[in-house]
A protein has these predicted regions:
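N-terminal helix-turn-helix DNA-binding module of bacterial transcription factors
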Residues: 1-68, 335-339, 343-344
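Bacterial carbohydrate/catabolite-sensing allosteric modules
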Residues: 1-5, 50, 88-99, 120, ...
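Short acidic/polar active-site loop segments enriched in Thr and Asp
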Residues: 22, 68, 125-126, 185-186, ...
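Amphipathic helical "hinge" segments at domain boundaries
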Residues: 38, 42, 53-126, 207, ...
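Short gly/ser/thr-rich secondary-structure transition/capping motifs
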Residues: 50-56, 110, 130-132, 230, ...
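Residue-level recognition of strand-loop junctions within catalytic nucleotide-signaling folds
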Residues: 75-76, 132, 333
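Short beta->alpha connector loops
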Residues: 106-109, 130-135, 252
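Active-site-adjacent beta->alpha loops and helix N-cap segments on the catalytic face
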Residues: 134-143
Length: 344
């Protein structure tokens, strides 16, 4: 048996030709649906191994009338934003008769790669993923195997993957401008880790609005976590005692920043106004209620699932990036700064 030529995508017909059998025989061997002779089975498995061939689970499931399984990888299930979006994605998949294999990577690239290997071995029909900062090789390998991949919240580096994201830069610029218009002048920004595309985009939106207003940018990195948000707020308060507003790049860092502000005895919004990215359920319950930049999570989740099913039905579709606008939920935390009694 001669070695197969190099191919980016292998079909069942290629395996059949190399093994000297029909495609139907290859299907029987790979699925174990009917017995074949040991000699034929060995030839088919050898050809499949040479090609690194993995049969389409989509086709097999459809023939058997079985439900599809889709892998969903989330980068931080404890983050209310991701929890809400994954819940909506799962509901949309369930409504389409699809089973979900859910994995939490906890922003760990090794875990992501390990889970993607599981997805490949389980022959999932598609993968929905909010990727870690790196680990793109494992995603590309999955795409090489013919598995459709749709990224959400953050795109992946491989241009063959679809993506459903928010317009992060425009949203943060909108929130920053709201504070400028309310009379704030010393507006700080608490951003996420620099390796994440969402963090870079939100920082760019802040800088654009601040520079347009002619103000000095005041930034600190909080790594999208509660403790990081607290440290970043403390840093900004120390470096800029006249700080009068904060734009915060996610809901977890907002919690930490609020802890730091209250520990310092700072009144909200009288002394420091706040606009935060993400609109968790507790935002409206705070006192003062939190002004937020809300992502349309339900619409984004539906777009993720619709794109995945379109890709599973037609693997030749060109990849797309679907970008959603965020909207301001204006509440008390962004009210204009109040002048002190007798002030000028």
């Amino acid at each position: 048996m001669n070695p197969p030529p190099h191919r980016m995508r292998v079909r069942i017909y290629d395996v059949a030709k190399l093994a000297g059998v029909s495609p139907a025989t290859v299907s029987r061997v790979m699925s174990g649906s009917r017995p074949v002779s040991e000699g034929i089975r060995a030839r088919v498995l050898d050809a499949a191994r040479r090609f690194d061939y993995q049969p389409s689970q989509l086709a097999r499931n459809l023939r058997r009338g079985q439900a599809a399984t889709v892998g969903v990888l989330v980068s931080d299930i404890e983050n209310p934003h991701f929890a809400s979006m994954v819940r909506a994605i799962e509901a949309a998949l369930y409504d389409r008769g699809t089973r979900v294999l859910l994995c939490n990577t906890a922003e760990d690239t090794q875990k992501q790669s390990s889970y993607l290997e599981v997805m490949a071995s389980e022959r999932v029909m598609g993968v929905v993923i909010s990727p870690t900062a790196d680990g793109d090789d494992a995603i590309s390998h999955l795409i090489d195997l013919g598995v459709p991949v749709v990224a959400f919240d953050r795109p992946v580096a491989d241009p063959r993957a679809d993506a459903v994201v928010a317009d992060n830069a425009a949203a943060i610029a909108l929130g920053t401008q709201l504070l400028v218009d309310s009379g704030r002048r010393r507006i700080g920004f608490i951003g996420g880790g620099e390796l994440l595309s969402t963090a870079a985009e939100r920082l760019a939106g802040y800088r654009s609005a601040i520079e347009s207003a002619g103000f000095e940018p005041l930034t600190a990195i909080g790594d999208f976590a509660v403790e990081g948000g607290r440290r970043a707020a403390e840093q900004l308060l120390t470096q800029s005692p006249d700080l009068d507003a904060l734009v915060i790049a996610n809901n977890l860092m907002t919690i930490g920043a609020l802890q730091a502000l209250r520990a310092s005895g700072i009144l909200l919004p009288e002394e420091v106004g706040i606009v935060a990215f993400d609109d968790p359920p507790w935002a409206s319950l705070l006192d003062p209620a939190l002004t937020t930049l809300a992502q349309p999570l339900r619409e984004m989740s539906e777009a993720v699932v619709e794109r995945l099913f379109a890709r599973m039905a037609d693997r030749t579709l060109p990849p797309v990036r679907i970008c959603f606008e965020c909207h301001l939920e204006i509440r008390q935390s962004s009210r204009g700064r109040m002048k002190s009694a007798g002030g000028g």
